[in-house]
A protein has these predicted regions:
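Extended, histidine- and acidic-residue-enriched regions that form the cofactor-binding/catalytic faces
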Residues: 1-109, 113-251
Length: 251
């Protein structure tokens, strides 16, 4: 297995050498927002960075520092929330891509832990294709529905994951010291008729900030799902890089 090549701990010479070996960089994207009373504000950052670190180890890609803020409008009035506007996050992604492309990065991988960041990833990737001809691939827990159906016991709240069995199980694998299971509660708030068709805020629906049942979370479930995510994302990274090289050769 490869040693993880983390930007924050590397010198300029080490980065130059690493880019020469495998010109792929991973940018984790997260958010700073409430996750109930049993999980910390940084869940989305921590999970994205944890998954990204394992993928970097598996593939040899360089690991960029995580973006700690995302689009968190729905929790804007709850203490601890820090939210970026979507176009600001898109601009951050693009600026990072322009920066790393200048010294040889050929493929940027976005690993996201916060679903509301997905639009920003998509539009940044499209614009970067036009501006730099740089391939950008992006992930938000690929195969999530199938893996949850296989490994989780509780239902989601209308397909949403937030402070639920899924996220709590992953936290129990990667950061168990930051999980307070004794404070975990299940909550499935009533869904307003105009939810998804108006500016109804999630922050107004759940008393606990939980959507689902984190009390059913276990380390074993988290391990099985995490291993699957690492396998899927790592395979896609290698495939995307091979395609990039074939395109360069005109194959």
């Amino acid at each position: 297995m490869n040693t993880v090549k983390e930007f924050r701990y590397m010198t300029r010479d080490e980065v130059e050498d690493a880019v020469g070996q495998f010109p792929v960089a991973i940018l984790p994207l997260g958010a700073t927002e409430q996750h109930g009373h049993h999980l910390p504000l940084g869940v989305d950052i921590m999970l994205a960075e944890g998954l990204a670190r394992l993928v970097a180890k598996e593939t040899g890609a360089l690991l960029l520092p995580a973006v700690p803020f995302g689009y968190s409008w729905v929790w804007r009035d709850i203490p601890g929330t820090v939210s970026l506007q979507q176009h600001h996050l898109e601009a951050v992604i693009k600026d990072v891509a322009h920066s790393v492309s200048r010294y040889g990065i050929e493929l940027l991988v976005l690993i996201n832990g916060h679903e509301a960041n997905t639009s920003s990833m998509k539009y940044a990737a499209r614009e970067l294709q036009d501006e730099l001809a740089m391939p950008v691939i992006y992930f938000f827990y690929p195969g999530l529905s199938e893996l949850m159906a296989e490994h989780c016991d509780s239902e989601t709240w209308h397909g949403m994951i937030h402070a639920c069995e899924f996220e709590t199980s992953l936290m129990l694998v990667m950061y168990p010291e930051h999980v307070q299971m004794e404070k975990a509660v299940a909550e499935y708030p009533e869904r307003p008729p105009l939810y998804g068709k108006s500016s109804v805020s999630l922050g107004d629906l759940s008393e606990s900030g939980v959507y689902g049942d984190p009390t059913k979370a276990t380390e074993e479930k988290g391990r099985l799902m995490l291993d699957a995510f690492v396998r899927i994302v790592s395979g896609n990274v290698k495939e995307a890089f091979d395609m990039t090289r074939k395109k360069e050769r005109g194959a």
